[in-house]
Regions:
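Long extracytoplasmic/lumenal interhelical loops at the membrane interface
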Residues: 208, 338-354, 358-402, 421-425
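Hydrophobic transmembrane alpha-helices and their immediate junctions
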Residues: 401-445
């Protein structure tokens, strides 16, 4: 295979030296001009410009590392910490986050990487669809600003939706064997860090953060003794569980080190997901696991069920020893599903969706723009009306903000990823991760009915990554018939 101009060894090879020199000259000139302007206007922004330049270099020299840091920062690191170290940000006014730098730098790299690689019909359609969606998001940002919506809200919602562009960054990386293996290794470490962070928050009784993405929120509805619900990482726990489970059971991993890491990550994320006490995330996890089981061979399906049962029993037993009241709370929370007719949260969501639906009907094609809000209250709970930018139904939220056509484009791309077949030459680990990514997408599609996945920075880049893992074929040649994950240790 001719690999000139493609991504190899985690680095972008542009081919001709003249092209590289010209590109670097243009980038250097642009950076110098920007630095001069910033020095004249606001000297403290020079540091931000220097960091931006360093991140851009990282994206071109080590794109796998750049992508891994983007996922780590958004899925694990709380937003309050990201915003504290942002450029021009504050408590109520988010600035330029480090995750923004990694995303933008990665998209610049992806533009060159995708342009220099052969695209089959499926990849071309998926890349084109994502580019069109991101362009619509940019237009909706301008739409919201033109209508006078709050810049902070417009910027935050735009940041989240642009995070789906991680798909474009990951697509070239997961298509080649070396970068794919390095990415798998990095994702295993991130999954472990995510689950460990969840348990640290729960056992350490971290207070509920202002951004709502860290700590333990006090109280558990419809239970008699629940002390709180884990919030930090809640959207990503099901994803980690499903993908780790698929890799462990279908990936034929020989290295005991990596198997041990994945087992630990699986157990920690199961425990963390359990103590969120969010029924939607439990159903999300079950839907994804069932998807993985559905496509497994007959004999292997029994093995998968036994492994899943063993992991669940071990995790539940450990939690019962550490926090005995957890199982009682989880049982009561699960039983409460049958009493949905008297559940005030169901009424809340139905009424809320009615207000959002009215806004969708008012602007079905163009959307109301990012930053749009609704004004309503809950008289049955004596909650006065107030302005809200949030909707629990993620599909309604997306159609409300960017319009029905753009929402249908993104959802269609997600659904199409569920039916992508593995190439005949695909190695077991890559096939397992692909199946896990498809299962995670299936679970997210279920959870989005009651939780707005598309409006959360903690999961949007992960969704883009899952799309790439599910859709991208392998372009690199296999070096061995049954790859071992021990080769990933070089990452």
């Amino acid at each position: 295979m001719n690999t000139t101009g493609t991504e190899l060894n985690g680095e972008l090879v542009l081919g001709r030296p003249f092209v590289r020199i010209s590109l670097l000259t243009l980038l250097a000139g642009a950076v110098a001009a920007l630095a001069g302007a910033l020095a004249a206007a606001q000297p403290k922004l020079i540091l931000g410009a220097a960091v931006s330049a360093a991140v851009l270099v990282l994206a071109f020299r080590a794109p796998v590392t750049n992508l891994a840091l983007l996922i780590l920062l958004t899925a694990v690191v709380p937003f309050e910490i990201l915003n504290r170290f942002s450029v021009g940000g504050g408590v109520d006014s988010p600035g330029l986050l480090f995750s923004d730098l990694f995303l933008l730098a990665g998209l610049v790299w992806a533009a060159f990487a995708l342009a220099s690689q052969p695209l089959d019909r499926r990849r071309y359609r998926s890349v084109f669809a994502m580019v069109v969606f991101l362009m619509i998001v940019v237009l909706e940002v301008l739409h919201g600003l033109r209508l006078g919506y709050g810049r902070s809200i417009v910027g935050q919602e735009g940041r989240v939706l642009l995070g789906l562009g991680t798909f474009l960054i990951a697509m070239p990386l997961v298509s080649h064997s070396r970068s794919r293996e390095r990415l798998f290794a990095a994702l295993a470490l991130i999954a472990f860090a995510l689950g460990a962070w969840g348990m640290v928050q729960w056992l350490g009784h971290f207070s509920f953060g202002l951004a709502g993405d860290v700590g333990v929120r006090s109280g558990v509805r419809l239970t008699s003794g629940g002390s709180g619900q884990l919030q930090g990482g809640a959207f990503a726990f099901p994803v980690a569980i499903i993908v780790c489970f698929a890799a462990l059971t279908l990936g034929e991993i020989r290295s005991w080190v990596w198997r041990g890491l994945l087992v630990a990550a699986l157990a920690l994320n199961i425990a963390s997901c359990l103590v969120t006490f969010e029924r939607s995330f439990w159903l999300d996890t079950l839907a994804g696991l069932l998807f993985v089981l559905l496509f497994a061979a007959g004999r292997r399906r029994v093995k998968l069920l036994l492994i899943l049962l063993g992991a669940g029993v071990f995790t539940v037993a450990a939690l019962a020893i550490i926090t005995p009241s957890t199982l009682t709370t989880a049982q009561q929370r699960l039983i409460s599903i049958s009493s949905y007719s008297s559940d005030t949260s169901v009424r809340y969501r139905v009424v809320e969706s009615g207000f959002v639906y009215d806004r969708i009907r008012a602007h079905p094609l163009t959307g109301s723009g990012l930053g749009a809000s609704i004004f309503w209250g809950q008289p049955w709970a004596q909650v006065p009306p107030k302005t809200r930018h949030y909707s629990h139904d993620g599909y309604f939220w997306l159609a409300w903000k960017v319009g029905v056509p753009a929402a249908a484009l993104l959802i269609g791309l997600l659904v199409s990823a569920l039916f992508t077949r593995s190439p005949a030459t695909e190695d077991p680990l890559s096939r397992a991760v692909r199946r896990g990514a498809q299962g995670a997408i299936a679970g997210l599609l279920v959870a989005t009915i009651t939780f707005p996945s598309f409006s959360q920075l903690s999961i949007a880049p992960v969704i883009g990554l899952l799309l790439a893992l599910a859709l991208a074929p392998q372009l690199g040649r296999r070096r061995r018939s049954r790859p071992s994950v021990s080769a990933l240790a070089a990452a």
